From Swiss-Prot:
ATP binds at G158, I159, P160, G161, S162, G163, K164, T165. Component of the replication restart primosome. A motif (DEAH box) lies at residues 256-259. Residues 145-313 form the Helicase ATP-binding domain. One of its GO terms (biological process) is DNA replication, synthesis of primer. The gene is priA. Initiates the restart of stalled replication forks, which reloads the replicative helicase on sites other than the origin of replication. Recognizes and binds to abandoned replication forks and remodels them to uncover a helicase loading site. Promotes assembly of the primosome at these replication forks. It comes from Borreliella burgdorferi (strain ATCC 35210 / DSM 4680 / CIP 102532 / B31). This is Replication restart protein PriA. Binds 2 zinc ions per subunit. It catalyses: Couples ATP hydrolysis with the unwinding of duplex DNA by translocating in the 3'-5' direction; ATP + H2O = ADP + phosphate + H(+). Zn(2+) 2 binds at C379, C382, C397, C400.
Length: 660
């Protein structure tokens, strides 16, 4: 709202830049806090948001610098609320990001909806409602959550297929009936289709269920943003940007598949969705319900310490079971696909049943390695081996997308004795087509377009495909009713990585993908292929021993002082000049010694495990402490003493998911 008074008003404005400060501008109209304006910043026009307002008579002394005029008013009413400002302050402080860039994160761009525009809500079968029936266990859990007065944070800890989603949907129905707002977090955009499809058939409220993510048109995002800001009752489904909506009546937060690493933003601001959800839960006194068959170790530890109410779901919603689980030691197998797995797939085909093959790698084969000198052909921009992709007949870097022709000889010793080591999804596809020429086979991974992936998934659901091969995407949220055989290839991928979460990742991935085969039928067969059958994460996943894995992993982390027993901050220095990155990393460390205390441990300075990515050399320091405030003080105080240059970029990650 703009009030027309003839006077001069001063405004502190947030601009989308990586600085944690506001900037003074003036205007001759009384503008509302929270609206967007156009300003001149360092010679270029930028959009800013008014955060504070001052009257001319509030300043007794004149400014020592010239204050520029606001160029243009963009909004007639505020686009953000006090809640958005509070949240941005909290995130920027916690993640060491600029206040302005944090405030703008998730905000729809300035665009206007078309006249009479309607939102793309779920409207395929608007008159159809499938009655959502809960079993006794689900009904008791549902009543416990909505009836609890003292406890507001819950975790549904149940094996895949135990019926967590049905409880989530029932909770959505309850809070919509109370005219409240619901935030439904999912780990990937691709899962939105599955979740929405299930809600659609359970509730006749298609006009109250929306997606909010980077794929949604900007005009639609503006409409959803305003609906939330105006207090309309709805369910909004999204990943990270959805957390920034201007909620006013938020009473339920759902976090499906809480363990997924995609909830952590790897771009500025580098927050974790779980941490912001806790902030929102306290702010709105909402219920926060997480769920997973494989909780993150941090969540499990919090449940163990009674910081989160653990609700164990004992029963499987579909009452299915796994008939047989086998581990195949691939050291004794000559082929990519073991004879045991091939036999099981053929048997499934004979019974008109389907097979799901999971492989933890993209690409056709992995590294191109010289048998003479052992040299691995790497990306010239990154310290990472190039991977062969058959469709393009090229070597591709999965970090910076560098492409080159396949090599005929070793660039190190000129030997022609070079071979591809290990294998990927495209080779598995080729092998299956060779052994089973009459089977209908498809694969889904991130090398294929989204439309092609969705088409393959739909065909598999409709039993038009016999064998579906996939990478990580098939471990996340899909329910296939006609599976007989599940094959897991390369179960131990990641085992040798120098990363404290590698064991947890392997256990989680195996447990989740095994759950895909155990939902509907009661004669499923799972075959796990590995060269390390005794590795603890594989062993516990194979035996379905969840609690035992978590206890052993906690013991390992405690001995190493890693999370959840310590807070961790990783600082990466990257530059196209290796010496510059190295020097700045060491300079930061030397300056930080002034603030190092006994309670703070450090690793480094050292080269990052992935030393070079996209032509940038990387050096890092890792700080650990039980007290986050000590780490926060150390980083902020050291930053003040270190002069940064345009040739070295610093990344501060307050909660690193990976140390690679």
């Amino acid at each position: 709202m703009v009030e027309h008074y003839h006077s001069t008003y001063y405004y502190e404005i947030a601009i989308n830049i990586p600085l944690n400060k506001l900037f003074f501008y003036k205007f001759n109209l009384n503008l509302e806090i929270g609206i967007r304006v156009m300003v001149n910043f360092n010679g270029s026009n930028k959009i800013g948001i008014i955060i504070k307002k001052y009257f001319e008579n509030e300043f007794k002394e004149k400014f020592e610098f010239k204050i520029k005029e606001i160029i243009k008013i963009i909004d007639t009413t505020k686009i953000i609320t006090e809640h958005n400002i509070d949240l941005a302050h909290w995130i920027s402080k916690k993640t060491f990001s600029g206040f302005g860039e944090t405030l703008f994160f998730g905000l729809p761009q300035n665009s206007k909806a078309k006249k009479n525009q309607t939102l793309p809500s779920i409207n395929e079968h608007p008159d159809h409602k499938k009655c959502l029936e809960l079993n006794n266990e689900q009904q008791n859990i549902y009543k416990e959550i909505i009836g609890s007065e003292k406890t507001n944070v819950f975790y549904l800890f149940g094996i895949p297929g135990s019926g967590k989603t049905e409880i989530f949907i029932k909770l959505c129905e309850y809070y919509l009936a109370l005219e409240q707002q619901v935030l439904f977090l999912i780990p990937e955009i691709s899962l939105g289709y599955q979740i929405i499809k299930r809600i659609k058939y359970a509730l006749n409220m298609h006009h109250k269920i929306y997606e909010y993510n980077s794929k949604v048109p900007n005009s639609d995002k503006n409409l959803i943003w305003n609906k939330v800001k105006n207090g309309e009752s709805l369910v909004v489904i999204g990943i990270k940007s959805v957390l920034m909506l201007p909620f006013t009546k938020l009473k339920l937060i759902i976090m499906d598949e809480e363990h997924e690493t995609t909830y952590k933003s790897e771009n500025i601001p580098r927050f974790h969705s779980r941490h912001i959800s806790f902030f929102l839960q306290k702010k709105f006194n909402a219920k926060f319900v997480m769920g997973s068959a494989t909780p993150s170790l941090e969540a499990y530890h919090a449940m163990k310490n009674n910081q989160i109410k653990k609700i164990i779901m004992q029963n499987k919603f579909s009452q299915s079971k796994i008939e047989d689980i086998k581990i195949i030691n691939m050291k004794k197998e000559p082929s990519t696909i073991s004879s045991e797995l091939l036999y099981s797939i053929q048997k499934s085909l004979n019974e008109k049943r389907q097979s799901l093959i999971f492989i933890n790698k993209r690409g056709y084969l992995k590294n191109l390695e010289c048998n003479e000198c052992g040299h691995i052909i790497c990306c010239p921009n990154c310290s990472f081996g190039l991977i062969y992709h058959k469709k393009e007949n090229k070597l591709l870097c999965h970090y910076c997308s560098y492409k080159t022709k396949t090599a005929s000889h070793c660039p190190q010793c000129e030997s022609k004795d070079i071979k591809y080591k290990t294998y990927g999804i495209q080779l598995v596809e080729k092998e299956l087509k060779k052994f089973l020429p009459n089977a209908k086979i498809a694969r889904i991974d991130s090398d294929i377009t989204k439309i092609e992936n969705i088409d393959s998934i739909n065909k598999f659901e409709n039993k038009e495909i016999d064998i579906l091969i996939g990478t990580q995407i098939i471990a996340k949220g899909f329910n296939f009713e006609n599976i007989k055989t599940l094959g897991i290839i390369n179960a131990d991928i990641g085992m040798g990585l120098p990363d404290f979460r590698s064991g947890e990742r392997i256990f989680t991935t195996l447990s989740q993908i095994m759950g895909r085969a155990a939902r509907f039928k009661d004669d499923n067969i799972i075959i796990i292929q590995t060269k390390n059958p005794n590795y603890y994460a594989i062993k516990y996943a194979y035996k379905n021993q969840y609690e035992q894995f978590y206890e052993e992993e906690l013991d390992i982390r405690k001995k190493l002082n890693y999370p959840p027993f310590n807070k961790i901050i990783r600082i990466i220095f990257r530059s196209k000049n290796e010496e510059s990155a190295k020097q700045k990393c060491w300079e930061f460390f030397e300056k930080s010694k002034e603030f190092l205390q006994e309670e703070i441990e450090h690793l480094g300075p050292s080269e990052a495990i992935m030393k070079k990515i996209s032509k940038n050399y990387r050096y890092n320091i890792i700080y650990l402490s039980k007290s986050y405030s000590l780490l926060e003080k150390l980083v902020n105080k050291t930053k003040e003493k270190v002069k940064m240059t345009s040739t070295v970029y610093i990344e501060i990650d307050y909660y690193p998911i990976s140390l690679i």
